[in-house]
């Protein structure tokens, strides 16, 4: 008690002083808050741009925690400005509508800001913000395009910010951010995302030594997350969705869980969108991991270098309606041609697809049901995917290894090698097919050559070939026994019994024939230039199959090879005549 009396006066004085400080701080908060509000309002009023209306609900400042709070910040486009976006005939700049319920800037260093013009902030927190981006859907014509000064997506090494001495943000967090991309001409939402989370850590602006008004951006880490989002892909005919997407700059890892790409419309409507036949895709993927992503390299240099892309448990369905004609004006490129034509540097050490399934189906005019080919237990390894010129000059070879079970039962393997240095884009492919019933080929060969296998066993098929962008040449050894087949009528439903009897009398029913060595036959196919790699490979193999089972086809295929190589009897006689003329 005596101690309390002794220090009573000091305690009272301290309490009064502390209370006074609190009152002063509270008064200052009101004053500073009012000043900041007036500054913001004046800045908005002085804007010369009348295309947007900017409003702020309330401004608060907490001097105890040095926190600035902005509530109900809205950026609204003028109605006439928005209406004019759809009426212009050429590409117009996109228009934004922004809603920010709450923006918190915490731990602001006032002293550094006043003394050094250095922006030092503990955290920048944005919650439940939403942006609508309105676009006219038009593309920029070549004459409207401005030349880029460099290949960088954005120059983070030279950010112009005159009037400040630098900056640091401990953490920039954007939570539950939403964005819509809206085509005003079609009244269609192209992209919609409503749960985007972004976190940037230790964001620094470092002044460039050779330019006092520009800064270099440094980031310690970036975390980016999205959940249950849906997007329309370019063209508007497919929808991309995923359950979760996450990116970590520290881990250099981008992950998608339960990703799918689906047609936007029914199959019949998708088919009707073109007057030509084309592939319709439907994809479900359990998980995708993209490793060793260097975000700084992508932004600064536009170089996309990844160590691996791993795709697990993919279900890929491809459908084509062959009632429609081919688009003969198309010129699909082969994989190595596509990489050589890239304008950006791309390098992926490996792409792995595992535990997957591919189903390809075609609906033919003369067949009631679609032809379906299924590759079960589908596993693919692609190595050395690159568009880097130095790598190509040094002789890098891109390789593809595919392992699967044809129609889910017969084991098969295909290897393809693309020497990227090849001037003629030469490539090689080889592989095998294991033991199974010949009937398994019916969905493939019936629409192609009108033959339906009734019995027979494939013991093994081995093949190898060399190809370029124009033709392929190779060889096949197809071992089988007890082959019998039917020749189908034009409607592909009924059997032509007479032709089937003739065919079975002529077809080579066993390879090897008893007491003979196995027949190895040539393969040849001249590429149809408006079709892709898959058709090129299959037609090459088809030439080997027909050359094996049909006696006359072996000499026909060999004749095609001789003509291509210039070694046919006709070519030899022509050269002999030319030599005789020279010697006269």
PLM features: what roles do these ranges have?
Residues 2, 37-45, 142-159, 163, ...:
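Sec-dependent signal peptide cleavage junction
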Residues 2-17, 415, 419-420, 432, ...:
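Extended terminal
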Residues 4, 13, 17, 117, ...:
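Elongated, acidic membrane-bridging lipid-handling scaffolds
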Residues 15-27:
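Single-pass alpha-helical transmembrane signal-anchor segments
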Residues 24-133, 169, 177, 182-186, ...:
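Terminal hydrophobic membrane-targeting helix
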Residues 124-128, 309-313, 459-469:
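Short secondary-structure subsegments characteristic of cysteine-rich extracellular domains
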Residues 138-147, 324-331, 449, 491-497:
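Flexible, surface-exposed loop regions and adjacent strand-edge segments
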């Amino acid at each position: 008690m005596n101690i309390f009396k002794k220090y009573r006066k000091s305690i009272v004085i301290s309490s009064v002083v502390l209370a006074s400080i609190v009152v002063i701080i509270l008064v200052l908060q009101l004053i500073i808050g009012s000043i900041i509000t007036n500054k913001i309002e004046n800045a908005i009023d002085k804007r010369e741009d009348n295309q947007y209306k900017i409003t702020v609900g309330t401004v608060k400042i907490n001097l105890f925690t040095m926190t600035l709070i902005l509530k109900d910040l809205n950026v609204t486009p003028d109605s006439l400005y928005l209406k004019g976006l759809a009426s212009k005939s050429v590409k117009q700049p996109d228009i934004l509508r922004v809603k920010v319920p709450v923006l918190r800037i915490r731990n602001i260093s006032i002293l550094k800001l006043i003394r050094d013009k250095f922006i030092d902030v503990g955290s920048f927190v944005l919650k439940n913000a939403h942006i609508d981006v309105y676009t006219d859907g038009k593309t920029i014509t070549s004459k409207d395009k401005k030349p880029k000064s460099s290949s960088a997506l954005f120059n983070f090494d030279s950010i112009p910010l005159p009037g400040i001495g630098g900056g640091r943000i401990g953490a920039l967090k954007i939570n539950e951010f939403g964005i819509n991309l809206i085509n005003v001409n079609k009244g269609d939402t192209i992209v919609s995302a409503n749960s985007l989370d972004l976190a940037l850590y230790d964001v620094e602006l470092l002044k460039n030594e050779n330019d006092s008004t520009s800064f270099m951006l440094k980031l310690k880490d970036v975390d980016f997350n999205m959940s249950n989002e849906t997007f329309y892909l370019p063209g508007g005919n497919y929808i991309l969705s995923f359950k979760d997407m996450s990116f970590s700059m520290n881990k250099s890892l981008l992950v998608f869980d339960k990703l799918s790409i689906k047609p936007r419309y029914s199959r019949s409507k998708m088919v009707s969108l073109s007057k030509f036949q084309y592939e319709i895709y439907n994809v479900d993927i359990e998980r995708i991991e993209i490793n060793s992503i260097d975000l700084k390299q992508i932004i600064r240099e536009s170089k996309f270098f990844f160590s691996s892309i791993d795709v697990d448990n993919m279900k890929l369905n491809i459908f084509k309606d062959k009632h429609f004609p081919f688009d003969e004006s198309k010129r699909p490129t082969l994989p190595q041609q596509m990489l050589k034509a890239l304008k950006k540097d791309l390098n992926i050490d490996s792409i792995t697809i595992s535990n997957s399934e591919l189903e390809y189906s075609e609906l033919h005019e003369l067949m009631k049901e679609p032809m379906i080919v299924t590759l079960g237990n589908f596993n693919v390894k692609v190595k050395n995917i690159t568009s880097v010129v130095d790598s190509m000059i040094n002789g890098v070879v891109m390789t593809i290894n595919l392992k699967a079970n044809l129609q889910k039962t017969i084991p098969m393997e295909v290897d393809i090698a693309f020497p990227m240095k090849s001037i003629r884009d030469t490539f090689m492919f080889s592989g095998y097919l294991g033991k199974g019933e010949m009937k398994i080929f019916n969905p493939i060969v019936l629409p192609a050559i009108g033959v339906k296998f009734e019995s027979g066993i494939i013991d093994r098929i081995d093949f190898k070939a060399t190809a370029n962008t124009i033709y392929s040449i190779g060889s096949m050894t197809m071992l089988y026994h007890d082959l019998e087949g039917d020749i189908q009528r034009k409607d592909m439903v009924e059997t032509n019994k007479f032709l089937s009897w003739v065919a079975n009398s002529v077809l080579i029913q066993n390879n090897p024939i008893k007491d003979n060595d196995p027949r190895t036959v040539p393969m040849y196919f001249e590429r149809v230039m408006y079709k892709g790699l898959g058709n090129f490979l299959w037609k090459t193999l088809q030439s080997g199959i027909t050359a094996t089972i049909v006696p006359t086809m072996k000499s026909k295929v060999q004749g095609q090879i001789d003509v291509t190589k210039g070694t046919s009897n006709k070519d030899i006689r022509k050269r002999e005549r030319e030599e005789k003329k020279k010697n006269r």
